[in-house]
């Protein structure tokens, strides 16, 4: 195996004579051969890394287990230059590989980027998410279908305090004692009777995470395909959206304490062998576990198995299938493995996820994955309710979002200021004591005035306090009818023609249109 070794900005070729070298053999070869040629002592202590940061540990492990192939670049870091030793992480499989021409690669492995933890991305919870796809006229109005109890639950859910850690969504994100929800559901529905069955269930889930679609089942990650095991032999058949016209078949045969997984493809009626992997069930499945036990107690080292199985079988199988079908090279977000798409979509808000789903059919399928919507639901709503395996997480998210918006609308209405009160009237208007009102004209005996002679004016209490011209200012006007039947306009300034007005030069001058009354001197 030929490798390239970089130390302090200097790169040297190195040839390891062993066919399947381990990390310890590589370390010894570097100390005896490479370090003296670079001017260092063979006793110099160093760390082997792939990214100049994370040291590889486990001298008994083979280089292939870390994804190192011929032509790869490895970096040496002297211990004097390292501030603190780093534990192996999910970035251990990062490598900038120069793969041989006889082994084409489709895309980088999902472990090449260490996505930061999204547990602190819950800041969008206090904001109203303005995605129009769920508030258009095509959707049902929230005020018509949301019950009061659900609204109260949504309001109380927002007031829950505390930290709610997210569960792992993929197998390469798990730690000891953790399994993805999809693996728990799949394991409980499979009815495993031995550790070989449990390992095949895990292999099936890894194929699903890589974007393969199983044949023989309509659901994606709830149940195992039909006739997946027969007479001690396991057989799984898949298709892939990027390999139309080709079928991938996994034949798993238990041999002693090993399981041999042979990958073949069916293209144009022919069958071609692609790859073969040997797995030891005892390394990833705990022995002596009773049926019905939690999957977290059954499986172990899921991160390691996910890296090995995908790097050594899944992605080479996908690349070889495209090569056999003579398909051109593809690039971009659409052709990324499904697990990388899910990890990208998980970092987005729901409005952006729905916008991406409207771009093309492939992104629509990826954005409708139930694993993604379960993760988004737990991130945005922090609901700890245990739900069944057939839960529609996208529909549940939509209902909870509508309830939250309705609860926010109700909470906003509760704190709105009340309408302005009616101004205080200093002079009350008394209701009429006798109903109906007298039918007599105003001013006639027995009319409105005689019913309440104490009040200055019942009809207009405000203007009654304003003295008219020629009257003395006071609290009340003189007690008299509002309208005089003889002189309808009482007061000293009558404007009717023929009336006597003080300071008039012609007090008895007839008005226009009528003669003077000749009977006035005799009266």
From Swiss-Prot:
The leader peptide range reads: none
What is the annotated localization of this protein?
Cytoplasm; Nucleus; Mitochondrion; Cytoplasm, Cytosol
Q: Output the InterPro entries linked to this UniProt entry.
A: F-box-like_dom_sf, F-box_dom, Fbxo7, PI31_Prot_N, Ubiquitin-like_domsf
Question: What are the annotated GO cellular component locations?
Answer: classical Lewy body; cytosol; glial cytoplasmic inclusion; Lewy body core; Lewy body corona; Lewy neurite; mitochondrion; nucleoplasm
Q: In which pathway does it act?
A: Protein modification; protein ubiquitination
Which keywords annotate this record? Answer: Cytoplasm, Methylation, Mitochondrion, Nucleus, Ubl conjugation pathway
Gene Ontology BP annotations: autophagy of mitochondrion; lymphocyte differentiation; negative regulation of G1/S transition of mitotic cell cycle; negative regulation of lymphocyte differentiation; negative regulation of oxidative stress-induced neuron intrinsic apoptotic signaling pathway; positive regulation of mitophagy; proteasome-mediated ubiquitin-dependent protein catabolic process; protein K48-linked ubiquitination
Q: What changes when the gene is disrupted? A: FBXO7-deletion mice expired without exception at the beginning of the fourth postnatal week, independently of gender. Before the fourth week, mice displayed significantly lower body and brain weights.
Query: Positions of the region Important for dimerization and interaction with PSMF1?
Result: 180-325
Chain ranges for the short sequence motif RFDP motif as given in the UniProt record = 482-485
What's a Gene Ontology MF term here?
A: ubiquitin binding
**One Pfam family named in its UniProt record:** PI31_Prot_N
Q: Which residues cross the membrane?
A: none
Q: In which residue ranges is the amino acid composition biased (Polar residues)? A: 98-128
Carries keyword Mitochondrion?
A: yes
Task: List the residue ranges of the region (Disordered).
Answer: 1-20, 85-149, 494-523
F-box domain boundaries: 330-376
Assembly = Part of the SCF (SKP1-CUL1-F-box) E3 ubiquitin-protein ligase complex SCF(FBXO7) formed of CUL1, SKP1, RBX1 and FBXO7. Interacts via its C-terminal proline-rich region with DLGAP5. Interacts with BIRC2. Interacts with CDK6 and promotes its interaction with D-type cyclin. Interacts (via the N-terminal Ubl domain) with PRKN. Interacts (via N-terminal region) with PINK1. Interacts with PSMF1.
Q: What is known of its domains?
A: The ubiquitin-like region mediates interaction with PRKN. The proline-rich region is important for protein-protein interactions.
Instruction: Give the protein's recorded name.
Output: F-box only protein 7
């Amino acid at each position: 195996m030929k490798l390239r070794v970089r130390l302090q900005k200097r790169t040297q070729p190195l040839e390891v004579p062993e066919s399947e070298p381990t990390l310890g053999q590589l370390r010894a070869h570097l100390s005896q051969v490479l370090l003296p040629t670079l001017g260092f002592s063979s006793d110099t202590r160093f760390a082997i890394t792939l990214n100049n940061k994370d040291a590889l540990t486990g001298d008994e492990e083979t280089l292939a287990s870390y994804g190192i192939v011929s032509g790869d670049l490895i970096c040496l870091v002297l211990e004097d230059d390292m501030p603190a030793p780093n534990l192996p992480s999910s970035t251990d499989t990062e490598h900038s590989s120069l793969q041989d021409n006889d082994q084409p690669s489709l895309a980088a492995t999902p472990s090449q980027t260490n996505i930061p933890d999204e547990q602190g991305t819950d800041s969008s919870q206090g904001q109203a998410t303005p995605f129009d796809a769920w508030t258009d006229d095509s959707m049902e109005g929230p005020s018509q279908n949301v019950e009061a109890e659900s609204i109260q639950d949504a309001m109380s859910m927002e007031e829950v305090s505390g930290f709610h850690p997210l569960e792992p969504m993929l197998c390469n994100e798990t730690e000891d004692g953790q399994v993805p929800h999809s693996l728990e559901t799949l394991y409980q529905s499979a009815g495993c009777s031995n550790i070989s069955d449990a390992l095949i269930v895990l292999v099936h889930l890894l194929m699903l995470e890589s974007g393969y679609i199983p044949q023989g089942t309509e659901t994606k990650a709830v149940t195992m395909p039909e006739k997946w095991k027969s007479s001690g032999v396991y057989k799984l058949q898949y298709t892939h959206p990027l390999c139309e016209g080709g079928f991938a078949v996994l034949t798993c045969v238990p041999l002693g304490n090993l399981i041999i997984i042979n990958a073949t493809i069916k293209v144009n009626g022919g069958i071609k062998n692609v790859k073969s992997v040997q797995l030891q069930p005892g390394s990833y499945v705990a022995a002596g576990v009773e049926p019905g036990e939690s999957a977290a107690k059954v499986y172990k080292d899921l991160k390691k198995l996910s890296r090995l199985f995908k790097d050594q079988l899944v992605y080479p199988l996908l690349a070889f299938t495209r090569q056999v079908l003579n398909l051109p090279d593809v690039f971009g977000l659409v052709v990324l493995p499904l697990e990388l798409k899910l990890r990208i979509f998980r970092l987005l808000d729901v409005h952006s996820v729905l916008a991406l789903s409207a771009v093309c059919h492939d992104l629509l399928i990826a954005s409708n994955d139930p694993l993604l919507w379960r993760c988004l639901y737990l991130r945005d709503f922090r609901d700890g309710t245990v739900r069944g395996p057939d839960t529609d997480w996208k529909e549940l998210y939509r209902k909870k979002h509508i309830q939250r918006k309705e609860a926010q609308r109700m909470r906003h209405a509760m704190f709105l200021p009340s309408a302005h009160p009616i101004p205080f009237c200093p002079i009350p208007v008394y209701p009429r004591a006798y109903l109906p009102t007298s039918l007599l004209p105003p001013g006639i005996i027995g009319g409105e005035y005689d019913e309440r002679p104490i009040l200055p004016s019942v009809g207009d209490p405000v203007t009654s306090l304003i003295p008219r011209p020629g009257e003395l200012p006071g609290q009340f006007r003189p007690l008299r009818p509002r309208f005089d039947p003889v002189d309808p306009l009482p007061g000293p300034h009558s404007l009717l023609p023929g009336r006597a007005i003080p300071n008039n030069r012609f007090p008895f001058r007839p008005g226009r249109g009528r003669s003077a009354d000749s009977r006035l001197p005799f009266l």
